[in-house]
């Protein structure tokens, strides 16, 4: 798998 951020992307 790839890198998964633990926080959502800011708008």
Swiss-Prot record:
| Residues modified as Pyrrolidone carboxylic acid | 1
Found, by tissue, as follows:
Expressed by the venom gland.
Which keywords describe this protein according to UniProt? Hypotensive agent, Metalloenzyme inhibitor, Metalloprotease inhibitor, Protease inhibitor, Pyrrolidone carboxylic acid, Secreted, Toxin
Provide the protein's localization: Secreted
Name the residues that span the membrane. Answer: none
GO cellular component term, pick one: extracellular region
Give a GO biological-process term: regulation of blood pressure
Q: Its Gene Ontology molecular function terms?
A: peptidase inhibitor activity; toxin activity
Quote the function comment for this protein: This peptide both inhibits the activity of the angiotensin-converting enzyme (ACE) and enhances the action of bradykinin by inhibiting the peptidases that inactivate it. It acts as an indirect hypotensive agent.
What family is it from?
Belongs to the bradykinin-potentiating peptide family.
Q: What is this protein called?
A: Bradykinin-potentiating peptide 11a
- Species source reads Crotalus viridis viridis (Prairie rattlesnake)
What does the record give as the organism's lineage? Eukaryota, Metazoa, Chordata, Craniata, Vertebrata
